[in-house]
């Protein structure tokens, strides 16, 4: 099969979740004999035309001077144009929809017959509170257009799958994100942050309102753990919401904003040795950092929503508000005694059985073959 990954910011990954996904899946598919191309913006530091057998197609992107939002529309448009007009792909995998819809309409993707265009719908983007009212309306329109113009949809979370079925009557294929079990934790990484094993809490997220950082912080501050074990907040603080959080909570003795941590071993070690891990993401789908926390054997306390429950199932305790966070922390020793081993063991098994990258390569290969069978038997 000839397969393309479009609307990713290149591989090897130096950007985010879709890029890590594209790297693992594309390399895995190449090892199985498929011809895979990943589109990459011109500003990506990796300039070779091949990576571990994957063809890299470099496309000019003005994002560095035009800005990420506007520039990404241009980059995605030119990438899809190349994939449709100059190549002969069997499958074009579209990673998200928020900057590709004008290209979908321009190229009349729904009537394309040469290639099968399948779109990963990501989360409920129009619910992201970082967008103002008008942007959310535009993104909601984009969602409808993605459903209309894509040949097939992919959902990385069963909550997302159910949403599209109920709202649009459209089926989507559940194909999750992945993670690998970690086994090289290094307690020495704690020293850099003045931490001790199981004597701190951790939250890892983009500092955006929909990730409910305020809920976790307020719950912590009103608990008996405030000042006893610090709450470590990992994430860039240069977002508007991040700046608000630092201004409001930065002087609290128990709350520490440490910025982003991009050394994977360091981050997973700090996750692993925590007393508990807060996961507040609430707009879906399957968040990569949640899978990484599961793979790192974290004791996870999660915001109560359908997306987190779809992944964690019975291997977490859930909080709908700050008061519940306070209640949990006030009883943390009993909670850990009752649940920690069962929850962490259960999450590790879930990663092995459902979210390992090798398993996901199997699933994607099988699904892409099925798509071609549908095409040739129509």
Give each language-model segment a name.
Residues 81, 135-153:
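Membrane-proximal helix-turn-helix segments that form the acceptor-binding/catalytic region
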Residues 4, 194-222, 232:
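Conserved donor-binding/catalytic core segment of Leloir-type glycosyltransferases
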Residues 8-14, 28-67, 159-165, 236-240:
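N-terminal strand-loop element at the rim of the active site
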Residues 295, 299-302:
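Short hydrophobic beta-strand element within catalytic cores of glycosyltransferases
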Residues 269-285, 298:
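Acidic donor-binding loop of glycosyltransferase active sites
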Residues 71-84, 89-122, 285:
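An aromatic- and histidine-rich active-site surface loop
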Residues 44, 179, 204, 229-243, ...:
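Glycosyltransferase donor-sugar binding loop
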């Amino acid at each position: 099969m000839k397969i393309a990954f479009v609307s990713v910011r290149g591989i090897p990954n130096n950007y985010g979740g879709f890029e890590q996904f594209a790297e693992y899946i594309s390399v895995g598919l190449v090892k199985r004999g498929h011809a895979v191309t990943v589109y990459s913006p011109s500003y990506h530091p990796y300039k070779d035309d091949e990576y571990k057998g994957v063809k890299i197609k470099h496309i000019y992107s003005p994002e560095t001077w035009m800005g990420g939002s506007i520039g990404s529309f241009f980059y995605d448009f030119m990438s899809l144009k190349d994939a449709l007009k100059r190549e002969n792909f069997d499958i074009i995998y579209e990673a998200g929809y928020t900057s590709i819809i004008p290209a979908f309409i321009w190229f009349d993707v729904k009537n394309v017959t040469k290639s099968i265009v399948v779109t990963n719908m990501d989360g409920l983007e129009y619910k992201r509170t970082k967008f103002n009212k008008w942007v959310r309306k535009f993104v909601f329109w984009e969602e409808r257009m993605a459903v209309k113009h894509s040949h097939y949809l992919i959902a990385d979370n069963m909550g997302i799958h159910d949403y599209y079925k109920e709202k649009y009557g459209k089926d989507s294929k559940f194909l999750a994100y992945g993670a690998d079990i970690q086994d090289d934790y290094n307690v020495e990484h704690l020293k850099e942050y003045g931490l001790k094993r199981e004597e701190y809490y951790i939250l890892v997220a983009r500092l955006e309102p929909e990730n409910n950082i305020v809920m976790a912080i307020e719950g912590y501050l009103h608990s008996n753990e405030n000042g006893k074990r610090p709450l470590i907040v990992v994430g860039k603080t240069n977002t508007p919401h991040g700046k608000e959080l630092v201004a409001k909570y930065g002087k609290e003795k128990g709350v520490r904003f440490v910025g982003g941590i991009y050394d994977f071993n360091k981050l997973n070690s700090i996750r692993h040795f925590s007393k508990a891990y807060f996961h507040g993401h609430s707009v879906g789908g399957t968040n990569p950092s949640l899978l990484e926390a599961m793979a790192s054997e974290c004791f996870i306390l999660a915001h109560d929503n359908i997306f987190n429950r779809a992944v964690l199932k019975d291997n977490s305790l859930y909080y709908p508000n700050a008061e519940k966070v306070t209640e949990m922390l006030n009883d943390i020793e009993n909670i850990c005694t009752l649940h920690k081993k069962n929850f962490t063991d259960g999450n590790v098994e879930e990663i092995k059985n459902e979210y390992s990258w090798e398993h996901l390569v199997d699933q994607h290969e099988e699904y892409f073959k099925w798509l071609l069978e549908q095409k040739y038997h129509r």
